[in-house]
Amino acid sequence: AASDVYKRQGHFYWDIYELYRHIVEGLKLAARKEDVEITSIGIDTWGVDFVCVGKDGGFLRQPYAYRDPHTMGAPDAFFTRVPRSHVYGWTGIQVMNFNSLFQLDTLRRNHDSALTAADKILFMPDALSYMLTGEMVTEYTIASTAQLVNANTRKLEDALLNELGLTQAHFGRFVYPGDRVGVLTKEVQRMTGLGDIPVIAVAGHDTA
């Protein structure tokens, strides 16, 4: 997947459409195998990266890759407003400059047009399952990598969202591993030769 990172104007992005194409091609190959019966599909990826989705359901920009340098120093900037101890107490997540919390705060401080226009924010596995099903969800384990989830309530922490200018409504419904996300869209069924196979939420973070 590293080959699907590209650099443009000094920033690193994922080509999410190319990742989706790989998934569709893989499903096509699997559908042709007579000795394989596909009963469900699950997607996991690396953590922290996300896609901004517009009101029309389209992606507003290719997602930044966590290797992008724009978050250098971002934690220190955030901790001038919210104490580090509070953030760690809520989330229990190791502070790293590329965590979604700091990516989002960097975009907010830079008046990023995609974030400003975002109706929904989808983490990478949820963005890919959305492309397969048309359903927008937020899977718990992938959300936990964002440093936005309260480890006690298992919900997004409002105090952090408020600091980012976001609300719970900016995220898809919460799902947990084993929950049903939806079924393949008619378009994906036509492209792959598969039927209405369910997409099931798995532990979406690859090291969960």
What are these regions (language model features)?
Residues 1-61, 77, 89, 162, ...:
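N-terminal glycine/serine-rich phosphate-binding loop of ATP-dependent small-molecule kinases
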Residues 58, 73, 113-115:
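Short helix-loop capping/hinge motifs at secondary-structure junctions, enriched
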Residues 72-83:
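Hinge/lid segment of periplasmic solute-binding proteins
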